[in-house]
Each structure stands twice: as C-alpha cells, then as structure tokens.
Amino acid sequence: MAEQAGAGSAQDNRGGGRDDRGGRGRRDDRGGRGGRDDREKSNYLERVVTINRVSKVVKGGRRFSFTALVIVGDGKGMVGVGYGKAKEVPAAIAKGVEEARKNFFRVPLIGGTVTHPVQGEAAAGVVMLRPASPGTGVIAGGACRAVLECAGVHDVLAKSLGSDNAINVVHATVAALKLLQRPEEVAARRGLPIEDVAPAGMLRARREAEALAVSAAREGTA
C-alpha cells in the first residue's frame, strides 16, 4: 500500500511538473510559428492580381491546377512580382508571394511620385508612367494600380497602351519602374548640377518629404 501511494504521489508530481512548466502549452503562449509568420506578413502589402485555372492533358485525362499572379511590396519603395502554380489556390498564392519576395527591387521616388516620365514594355504590354502633383492619387488600371500601390507610389498618372492582359500589364509596369533613375544619377552622368537636371518643383517636393520624415522620426523617438 505504501509503495502504491508513493508511486501515485510520484505520478502526481510528474504531472504537476508538466503543468507548471507549461509543456506543449508554451507553444500556444508564444504564438507558435503561425504567430511569427503573421507578424512577418503584416509588414508587407500583398495583392493577388489574377488567378487562373490551367489543365494538363495526360494519358489518364486532364490534370487541373491553379496559377496566381501576386504583387508584394513594403509601401516604401520596395516591390516584387511573383507567379505561383499549384493544385490548390492557397498554395499557388503562397508560392507567388515567396517568388515575389525573391524578386524585390528598389523604386526611386520623390515626394510619393515617380522621378520622371517613363514607358515600359513587356511582351505585348506597354505602360506609360508620368509624375503627378500631391493629391492626384494613383490614376491607373487594376493590374498596374496593384504594382504602384505596393511600391509606395501615391501620386502618378499611368496609361496602358498595349495588351490588356493582366500578366503583360504587370510586367510592363515593372519594366517601367526599373527604368526610373534618381536625379543625382542623371546629373552625375551628364556632369551637370542637379538643379539643371530636375525641375524645381520636384526638388522642393523632395525637401518637404525629407523634412516630414525627419519630424516623424523625432516624434517617434520622443
């Protein structure tokens, strides 16, 4: 009887130890891997432009799968495009997001708009971008708008001059953004002062944006 009571108390102590330590419950308290993934995803803007169902003819019939065109950006000048394919829609979107993050590139912006007029081409898609004054907004179509918003462009005039296929429009928009150059780069290449290269309004808008960023940083540290 004493041995049985001792064994029972030992089991109770071991069980209590697990309860005190939290055991598997600690993963739930920390949020698990899902919590970390949610926090990481919240730092980026994700836009699913289009989802298509495709099929492959095999000996036994047809095999269906889904493709997803995804735009990912931080809203501060970084953006990327990804194309995912899987048997299920969520898996295709996840693959597209992963590829888009691998394709990140920096977009030069001044005061929330593009630095100069530019035209990008990809396959049959042609997209033209023009700078716009503050308050104009993003004047663009659906596929082009998704890229510009994820890149952090707030004021721009965009026009699609070629194919209206979403994939072509997205890649043409990316090609246009990759052609953008900062005024310092153009001035250095031409050997001219920056005032002779960039319009006065653009330089003034950049100074105002930098002043706002500095004031916001000071308020955040205060």
Curated annotation (Swiss-Prot):
Pfam family, one: Ribosomal_S5
Region ranges (Disordered): 1-41
An individual GO BP term: translation
Biased composition (Basic and acidic residues): 15-41
Domain of life per record: Bacteria
Regions that span the bilayer: none
Annotated ranges, domain S5 DRBM: 44-107
GO molecular function, one term: rRNA binding
Gene Ontology CC entries for this record: small ribosomal subunit
Keyword list, A-Z: Ribonucleoprotein, Ribosomal protein, RNA-binding, rRNA-binding
Family: Belongs to the universal ribosomal protein uS5 family.
Oligomer and partners: Part of the 30S ribosomal subunit. Contacts proteins S4 and S8.
Stated role: With S4 and S12 plays an important role in translational accuracy.
Protein name as catalogued: Small ribosomal subunit protein uS5
Organism, scientific name: Mycolicibacterium gilvum (strain PYR-GCK)
Gene: rpsE
